């Protein structure tokens, strides 16, 4: 399993500038994350930038005051670099080509992807080939900018902590009324759109109804909700089981689970040490057990 950060993407673009034509007139970003890659590229190359749909509807590429130092080309047919962050099956690439087809008489389009990770080869330039990580079902490349918004077949193989991931960490639950009021109205953080595999939370099972209601109200779909099997704080405390141990035990018993997403770094590290399986910490953006 390979984990790619935003810093990794910027580094890959910077280290591969020699692969990118420097005589293009502007850059088009394919929504959504392709715009992120295109923006970084436009900064490095000091080129005007526009997103795909704005270009289709007639808007002009822009780039701020720094572009006044850049000499524009006088060629009649402008060259545009069409950028996406990743290429796997090629759906977004094909849709972009279809949308841009009516403009081919006026523009020359060069298609570029930062990370080539799949079977589709219909691309002019790929900055980094990561297909060795995606050549079978057991391997995957995960990206910082969309790790919590994958499609269902990937998210279904993830286990999620709840507090600190889906919602802000609650106050000390020994103040029962304050804690109860908070988890009923917890402030949301990351809300996955696709159905996820399992939520593994150290919350007491006595709070199941409240937790299920909050998840439903915020559109979080899941296969399983696993909570600590105790009804009171004292009962859980007297068990001697730490949050990390509880989560690691569940993770170890799920052979199909490929990643645990945890909110707290010390717990993330402990879960990885106890299971030997990959763990991602959302608060520190650290990935344990990947490349």
Residue ranges and their predicted role:
Residues 31-34, 203-204, 264-265:
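Helix N-cap/beta->alpha junction signal
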Residues 190-212, 226:
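Substrate-recognition element of Asp-dependent hydrolases with the DxDx(T/V) motif
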Residues 1-162, 167-186, 209, 213, ...:
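PRPP-associated nucleotide enzymes
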Residues 221-255:
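Donor nucleotide-activated moiety binding/catalytic core segment of transferases
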Residues 87-94, 246, 251, 264-275:
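Acidic, divalent-metal-coordinating active-site segment for phosphoryl/phosphodiester hydrolysis
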Residues 46-54, 109, 222-227, 277-286:
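Short hydrophobic/aromatic-enriched beta-strand-loop microsegments
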Residues 112-114, 256-291:
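Acidic, Mg2+-coordinating phosphoryl-transfer loop and its flanking beta/alpha structural elements
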Residues 79-84, 241-265:
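Conserved Lys-Pro-Asp/Glu-containing loop-to-beta segment of HAD-superfamily phosphomonoesterases
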């Amino acid at each position: 399993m390979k984990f790619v950060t935003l810093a990794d993407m910027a580094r890959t673009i910077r280290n591969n500038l020699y692969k990118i034509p420097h005589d293009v007139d502007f850059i088009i970003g394919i929504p959504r994350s392709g715009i992120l890659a295109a923006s970084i590229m436009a900064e490095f190359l000091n080129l005007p930038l526009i997103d795909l749909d704005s270009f289709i509807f007639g808007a002009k590429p822009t780039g701020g005051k720094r572009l006044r130092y850049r000499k524009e080309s006088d060629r009649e047919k402008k060259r545009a670099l069409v950028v996406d962050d990743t290429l796997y099956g090629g759906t977004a690439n094909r849709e972009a080509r279809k949308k841009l087809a009516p403009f081919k008489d006026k523009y020359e389009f060069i298609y570029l992807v930062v990370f080539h990770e799949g079977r589709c080869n219909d691309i002019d330039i790929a900055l980094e080939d990561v297909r060795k990580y995606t050549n079978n079902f057991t391997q995957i490349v995960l990206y910082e900018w969309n790790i919590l918004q994958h499609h269902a077949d990937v998210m279904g193989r993830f286990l999620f902590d709840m507090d600190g991931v889906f919602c802000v960490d609650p106050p000390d639950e020994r103040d029962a009324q304050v804690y109860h009021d908070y988890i009923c109205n917890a402030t949301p953080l990351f809300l996955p759109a696709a159905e996820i595999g399992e939520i593994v939370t150290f919350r007491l099972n006595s709070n199941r109804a409240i937790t299920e209601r909050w998840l439903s109200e915020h559109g979080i779909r899941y296969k399983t909700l696993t909570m600590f099997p105790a009804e009171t704080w004292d009962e859980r405390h007297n068990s001697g089981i730490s949050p990390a141990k509880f989560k690691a035990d569940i993770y170890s018993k799920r052979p199909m689970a490929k990643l645990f997403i945890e909110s707290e770094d010390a717990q993330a590290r402990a879960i990885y040490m106890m299971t030997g399986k990959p763990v991602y910490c959302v608060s520190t953006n650290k990935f344990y057990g990947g490349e």
